[in-house]
Amino acid sequence: MKKYQNKNPIITPAVQIWLAEQTAAGFTRARLFESLCASGWQASEAAQIMALTADEREAFGIQIRPLQTDQTSHVPQPKLIFHDVQVDGGDKWVRVLQQRSAPDLIEFEGLLSDAECDALMQSAQPRLSRSLTVDVQTGGHEIHPDRSSQGMFFERAESPLIATIETRIAKLLKWPATHGENLQILRYPPGAQYLPHYDYFDPAQAGTVELLKRGGQRVATLIMYLREPDSGGATIFPDIDLAVTPKRGNAVFFSYAAPEASTLTLHGGEPVITGEKWIATKWLRQSVFE
């Protein structure tokens, strides 16, 4: 495979390949620029990737604003000890399977017990409905074809089980339990998937102002696997060519200090082929989520 050399961390090999393929297919530079922005890149990042000229920027009719470095946030950061093998979760020690710095990502083993996984699924089952995504225009929620799972949210500390898990997560990630959205349970039957996306709220979208009123920007995501499918359903990170295989009780955590595609946190859920995949997701916010 050809090795790509570049000194710009936001221009990943995947982006370079995509840009070359789309150019060869005959798409205009204006269309490519719009596609990058629609995929989560800030306009200034997209302009940098494409090396837009001043004339092109003016012709596209889009004002290129500087990168929002003032939006960089403090993020959850687990404290690793024992040579990066285990993390203190308060009521249990949790083993680290892998750790990466670009993006900031950790895969945990045994964050949840089998009994906890079963109890979460049993409690969630009667409350499942078609999963919603954030409506970026209004700040509300909508059904989106990119997400074909079923889901529900628990209230914060609504039961001893939920309170225990939330407390463990807070200890593990060094982040207050109040600074996170309610725990979400998702069920993916055969064929269900979630196409690659970013979890942060795009500052360029109209609905973001409303979304930020309830706790500020999202700064990290924790995905916990409650049931592993027989095949398929991996959590993928296309920008870093990583696929995390679901395993019951395990979890993958990743943070993003700014709402920018350069955080390399583009991720998705591959289609489940056989069996079912169940996950619990916790999104962490800058401040108290109400």
Residue ranges, per PLM feature:
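Fe(II)/2-oxoglutarate oxygenase catalytic core
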Residues: 1-28, 33-253, 257-290
